[in-house]
A protein has these predicted regions:
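C-terminal structural segments of small proteins and small subunits
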Residues: 44-75
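A structural micro-motif recognizing beta-strand termini
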Residues: 17-20
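Absolute protein N-terminus
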Residues: 1-2
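Short alpha-helix capping/helix-loop boundary micro-motifs
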Residues: 23-26
């Protein structure tokens, strides 16, 4: 499952970060690295962008970028 598919209020753990070159490096620099827990806080009215909580802070990313982040949803 990818981060863009996770519902509001749900949590998951990052398993892999995809993307090419600068995009991948930017995601990693923002703290989106494997084995990190993420929580979807809210989604904009039109569905893009999404706000997530990672490492104790809120981060807003485009849905297109979130599609490059593989996660394992916590049950």
């Amino acid at each position: 499952m990818t981060l863009d598919k996770l519902s509001v209020g749900k949590c998951g753990t990052i398993t892999a970060v995809g993307g090419e070159g600068a995009l991948r490096l930017r995601l990693l620099d923002m703290g989106l690295i494997p084995k990190t827990k993420v929580n979807v806080v809210k989604v904009a009215p039109m569905g893009d962008p999404i706000e997530i909580r990672v490492r104790g802070y809120e981060l807003t990313i485009r849905k297109e970028d979130a599609a490059n982040i593989e996660i394992q949803e916590e049950k």
